[in-house]
């Protein structure tokens, strides 16, 4: 039986603030020992009062604007009450019915063109601590360094239909957050986490009962959890069973979901307004000020790259990476007004040759010694006919190490040979060394000429233009 999946995502991003959202406790705890970044408010001690972090509010506003949301003029925090060891206050401060942003959208690439995913809301909240479960131990350990860190949670409408679309959406959200400087959005560091709500139904029938898969910490896990859970629900329904509204976890090792608890309803959390924080008024002037500080968004970069003549797949790749787009833009600007590097050729070199070489070193462009101006110069030397593509590839390791390609070409005498006399001499030597191939070519086997072409290029040290060699070789053979 064929089923259709209905999927919504809840994405949590840890905001780039120096201190936690409701206290002055430092928030840069990564790499620290357990429970080193706590304070009385983080620990939920009696008598402590929250103070809202202004930067967290502005980053949330910026993120909402980046998603095309309406920023609320009035918002407030509520206590979301629950009992769990990683929440020492026994409640989370979140924005219940007054989120800071709502009604946005994000267009993601699809097979038939852009596909729109609607954003229901984005709201601020404080993060929980972290439970560590030692293998085979009869206890768990609690680290509260993360507790109280500033989070923004973004909730989509149930517009997503499959794992690849979900992955494309998350990549776009990550690119927006990183481009704006709102969050590092690194799943491997826990700075971007995702919950998946998924149900299935037969075409034309009402939606089924949804389940929630919690705390997925990689885009690949999100995609695989969607695939597994859709298949599991289909198997249950085909066997005559029912789907219950549960909260599930994801077993990365077993590649399957598991039951965590029966899904709570809103009433279970007993939301009520936070009495120690006044409601927040956000003026149009404040919104305009934040909007004016926003850097270029990935969608704007994409349009700029398209206009420059970069092919769609490369433009998408560049626009989704802050480090690659920054490097590419600097390289593109580095040429003189009369000799700008070709936009597509530069993208080819950056995304293929450079990316491949750096991947082998387990580096990105931001970690390497490669200079944007040097890559632009390398592409420019090829375009100007000063060196061949082969010579450029041979020079790449040195260019990656920070050396100027123009200087290397001059020092090593690598400029393209334009002396046809030298090329003719190399051709004569190759023909004399392989008379059998010469006879084959003159006998009508034109493809056999490649057996002569290689030795000529080798004799010229790769410094002759291939088209010139082929032209001279053709003339020498009388073709």
Swiss-Prot record:
SUPFAM superfamilies associated with the record: GatB/YqeY motif, Glutamine synthetase/guanido kinase
Gene name for this UniProt entry: gatB
Alphabetical list of PROSITE patterns matching this protein: GATB
Function: Allows the formation of correctly charged Asn-tRNA(Asn) or Gln-tRNA(Gln) through the transamidation of misacylated Asp-tRNA(Asn) or Glu-tRNA(Gln) in organisms which lack either or both of asparaginyl-tRNA or glutaminyl-tRNA synthetases. The reaction takes place in the presence of glutamine and ATP through an activated phospho-Asp-tRNA(Asn) or phospho-Glu-tRNA(Gln).
Family: Belongs to the GatB/GatE family. GatB subfamily.
Subunit text: Heterotrimer of A, B and C subunits.
Domain of life: Bacteria
GO molecular function annotation: asparaginyl-tRNA synthase (glutamine-hydrolyzing) activity; ATP binding; glutaminyl-tRNA synthase (glutamine-hydrolyzing) activity
EC number(s) from the headed UniProt entry: 6.3.5.-
Organism: Deinococcus radiodurans (strain ATCC 13939 / DSM 20539 / JCM 16871 / CCUG 27074 / LMG 4051 / NBRC 15346 / NCIMB 9279 / VKM B-1422 / R1)
UniProt keyword terms in alphabetical order: ATP-binding, Ligase, Nucleotide-binding, Protein biosynthesis
Stated name of the protein: Aspartyl/glutamyl-tRNA(Asn/Gln) amidotransferase subunit B
Listed GO biological process terms: glutaminyl-tRNAGln biosynthesis via transamidation; translation
Catalysed reactions, semicolon-separated: L-glutamyl-tRNA(Gln) + L-glutamine + ATP + H2O = L-glutaminyl-tRNA(Gln) + L-glutamate + ADP + phosphate + H(+); L-aspartyl-tRNA(Asn) + L-glutamine + ATP + H2O = L-asparaginyl-tRNA(Asn) + L-glutamate + ADP + phosphate + 2 H(+)
SMART domains xrefs: GatB_Yqey
Coiled-coil residue windows: none
């Amino acid at each position: 039986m064929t089923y259709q999946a209905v999927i919504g995502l809840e994405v949590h991003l840890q905001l780039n603030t120096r201190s936690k959202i409701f206290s002055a406790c430092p928030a840069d705890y990564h790499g620290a020992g357990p429970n080193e970044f706590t304070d009385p408010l983080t620990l939920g001690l009696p008598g402590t009062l929250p103070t809202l972090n202004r930067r967290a509010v502005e980053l949330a506003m910026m993120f909402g604007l980046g998603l095309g949301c309406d920023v609320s003029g009035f918002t407030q925090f509520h206590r979301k009450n629950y009992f769990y060891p990683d929440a020492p206050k026994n409640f989370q401060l979140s924005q219940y019915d007054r989120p800071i942003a709502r009604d946005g959208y994000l267009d993601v690439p699809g097979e038939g063109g852009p596909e729109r995913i609607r954003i229901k809301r984005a709201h601020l909240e404080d993060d929980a601590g972290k439970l560590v479960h030692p293998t085979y131990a009869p206890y768990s350990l609690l680290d509260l360094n993360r507790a109280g860190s500033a989070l923004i949670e973004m909730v989509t409408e149930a517009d997503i239909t499959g794992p690849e679309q979900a992955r494309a959406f998350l990549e776009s959200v990550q690119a927006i957050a990183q481009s704006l400087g709102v969050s590092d959005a690194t799943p491997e560091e826990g700075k971007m986490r995702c919950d998946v709500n998924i149900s299935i139904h037969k075409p034309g029938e009402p939606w089924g009962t949804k389940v929630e898969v919690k705390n997925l910490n990689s885009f690949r896990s999100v995609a695989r959890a969607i695939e597994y859970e859709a298949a599991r629900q289909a198997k249950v329904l085909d066997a005559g069973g029912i789907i219950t509204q549960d909260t599930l976890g994801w077993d990365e090792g077993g590649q399957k979901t598991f039951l965590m608890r029966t899904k709570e309803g809103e009433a279970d959390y007993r939301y009520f307004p936070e009495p120690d924080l006044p409601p927040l008024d956000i003026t149009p002037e404040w919104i305009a000020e934040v909007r004016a500080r926003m850097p270029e968004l990935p969608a704007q970069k994409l349009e700029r790259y398209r206009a420059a003549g970069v092919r769609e797949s490369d433009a998408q790749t560049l626009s989704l990476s802050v480090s690659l787009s920054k490097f590419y833009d600097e390289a593109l600007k580095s040429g003189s007004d009369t000799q700008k590097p070709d936009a597509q050729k530069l993208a080819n070199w950056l995304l293929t040759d450079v990316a491949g070489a750096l991947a082998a070193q387990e580096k990105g462009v931001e970690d390497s010694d490669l200079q944007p101006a040097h890559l632009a110069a390398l592409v420019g030397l090829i375009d100007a006919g000063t060196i061949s593509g082969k010579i450029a590839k041979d020079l790449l390791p040195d260019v990656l190490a920070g050396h100027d390609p123009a200087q290397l070409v001059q020092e090593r005498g690598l400029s393209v040979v334009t002396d046809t006399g030298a090329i003719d001499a190399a051709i004569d030597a190759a023909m004399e060394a392989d008379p059998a191939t010469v006879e084959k070519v003159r006998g009508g086997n034109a493809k056999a000429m490649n057996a002569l072409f290689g030795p000529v290029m080798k004799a010229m040290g790769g410094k002759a233009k291939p088209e010139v060699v082929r032209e001279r070789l053709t003339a020498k053979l009388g073709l």
